Design a protein with these regions (language model features):
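Extended soluble regions of mature proteins
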Residues: 25-250
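C-terminal segment of classical bacterial N-terminal signal peptides
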Residues: 15-24
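Bacterial N-terminal signal peptides that target proteins for export
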Residues: 1-12
Length: 250
């Protein structure tokens, strides 16, 4: 059961990963999104509904993504490092770039990888709508997930806009690294390059063990301003731990 919940957490992380980043200037960019996840009951255990704010800071060669108040991910291209920070446990994992899973994954995680297969498909539609101030195009994402003989299909409806002055290559650079943190998502980076623009609204549903989980994520704002001191640094007093993508918590 814990592995199934951990998998859903990974998928949620994946969904939250699509903070796309605007063009660079002297100041950094601060991006805010809101995410709602419906309540779900799996094997008699109920996960309550959750509302949380996600935020991303991005500079020229570094970024920080916060998922609520419990977890942060820092990418430092200047140091060739990624840090995964757990604020509840006060721990962090350090990963060298480029990522080599043969070196960093524990044996248990490698065994889990062998039991999983994840295949994404992105389809652009002709549907358009204006969301807030942004003209958007609808994309459909179908994800086929196989784990230990179980099929756990996932569907995403993504409304994407080119109205926000996005540097797509910069976006791909950072989100590619975030997706690569999860070895089962290794095929996602190329497939999601089919999307031309910035995800303004994402609706996600996933089937797992007879239950359906739904979430909604929407862009709130994009600002250009100086990041507070220490934004891209590790917090003091945290303990270093081994990285295991199947045990990441939100």
């Amino acid at each position: 059961m814990k592995k199934k919940i951990a998998l859903w957490s990974l998928i949620s992380i994946f969904a939250l990963t699509f903070f796309i980043f605007p063009k660079q200037g002297k100041a950094d960019y601060f991006i805010k999104k809101l995410r709602h996840t419906d309540a779900v009951t799996i094997m008699g255990q109920t996960q309550p509904a959750k509302d949380e704010e996600g935020s991303t800071w991005m500079g020229k060669d570094r970024m920080r993504q916060d998922e609520g108040t419990n977890k942060s991910t820092i990418v430092r291209f200047d140091l060739q490092k990624i840090y995964i920070i757990d604020h509840v446990q006060k721990t962090y994992s350090e990963i060298d770039l480029p990522i080599d899973f043969e070196k960093i994954l524990p044996d248990q995680a490698k065994q889990m990888m062998q039991m999983m297969k994840v295949t994404p498909k992105v389809t652009k539609t002709e549907e358009t709508q204006k969301i807030k101030d942004w003209n958007c195009v609808k994309y459909l994402v179908d994800i086929d997930m196989q784990m230990m003989g179980m099929n756990m299909p996932m569907k995403m409806e993504m409304w994407v806009s080119k109205d926000i002055g996005i540097d797509i290559k910069l976006y791909e650079k950072f989100t590619g690294q975030l997706l690569s943190l999860q070895p089962m998502f290794k095929d996602f980076t190329e497939e999601f390059k089919k999307m031309d623009g910035y995800p303004v609204l994402t609706l996600t549903s996933m089937e797992m063990m007879g239950s359906q989980t739904k979430s909604r994520e929407e862009l709130v704002s994009v600002e250009k301003k100086d990041a507070p001191a220490g934004t891209y640094d590790l917090p003091e007093g945290y303990t270093k731990t081994e990285y295991n993508p199947f045990e990441q918590k939100r």
